[in-house]
Amino acid sequence: AAVRASPDLLGSRGEDTASDGSVVWAKPYTFRAPPTPGQNSLQRIIVFGDMGKAERDGSNEFANYQPGSLNTTDRLIEDLDNYDIVFHIGDMPYANGYLSQWDQFTAQVAPISAKKPYMVASGNHERDWPNTGGFFDVKDSGGECGVPAETMYYYPAENRANFWYKVDYGMFRFCVGDSEHDWREGTPQYKFIEECLSTVDRKHQPWLIFTAHRVLGYSSNSWYADQGSFEEPEGRESLQKLWQRYRVDIAYFGHVHNYERTCPLYQSQCVNADKTHYSGTMNGTIFVVAGGGGSHLSSYTTAIPKWSIFRDHDYGFTKLTAFNHSSLLFEYMKSSDGKVYDSFTIHRDYRDVLSCVHDSCFPTTLAS
């Protein structure tokens, strides 16, 4: 591909053309270079999971498994001018070993991915297959073992077979985990996650986001509730202390095909009674399930846990808008109409993040 970009500051527009230098193979696409780490500008991020793919006439779909997929895709195409980057957190085409389904998916999202960075995470339908080094010994990937996902999309991992990486995007740092490999304390992934969370400069990048496909945090999905843990087995037992110690603002998950948001949580307890606005000292992480991208919907438990603030059994996606270093807006929108059905704001200074609460500060002595 031939790439031409303005020599000005990052954030300028460029052009990408597929060619060999003499013959142009496809129409040119324009793109905007990303903001530098810490750059103070309007930054808008879309996050969702489990979208899948579909056809307008349904001619090649089995049982209409991802009925909301086209609505989500269409809505994001219509709204291209109002966001800057996309995070699709696992379960992309549900190809399950049929490579033609990857072609269908990439064609469906091409109007988005040709113009916006399209970041991806590994889900069970990309990676899982018995005896291949994954954490789950199931056949959800249809034998893909992560290879098509690693090949189709770029992500800045040191080892592309390990689908964990970080993204510095302006005032945000995203620590993207791989829930299909072992994340527990003592593993290489746990070491990466701690390094990713601990090395961010919160004065310049105040918005710290963790994401993974399976629910390593909290969900009132019926099958998690039946287990009594409201999480993937062993999901948060190791990671929770990292989210708490390093003050993760929002932890995102997919896998469960619906939407749910928690209150700010510390040790499974709500630490803020407000539901729509959070300010001052940062003392808990908000957990979001955004798995309603398009695949068949998942059910909730009948009893609503105290930490569950908002649930929606429908297809949708979320949007983060950072206005500056101290103001963040979160929105959840339905794919059917693009309207906002849940939202909250965060307003705080970086010193509110650094203030010691709970066990977030390391012990010190007079000598230190």
UniProtKB/Swiss-Prot annotation:
Glycosylated. InterPro entries: Calcineurin-like_PHP_ApaH (IPR004843), Metallo-depent_PP-like (IPR029052), MPP_PAP (IPR041792), Purple_acid_PPase_C_dom (IPR025733). This is Nucleotide pyrophosphatase/phosphodiesterase. SUPFAM superfamilies: Metallo-dependent phosphatases. It is an enzyme of class 3 (hydrolase). Belongs to the metallophosphoesterase superfamily. Keywords: Chloroplast, Glycoprotein, Hydrolase, Plastid. GO terms for molecular function: hydrolase activity. Its EC number is 3.-.-.-. Its main location: plastid. It is found in: Plastid, Chloroplast. It comes from Hordeum vulgare (Barley). The keyword Cytoplasm does not apply. Monomer and homomer. Hydrolyzes pyrophosphate, phosphodiester and phosphosulfate linkages of nucleotide-sugars, sulfonucleotides and nucleoside di and triphosphates. Highest activity observed with the substrates ADP-glucose and adenosine 5'-phosphosulfate. GO terms for cellular component: chloroplast.
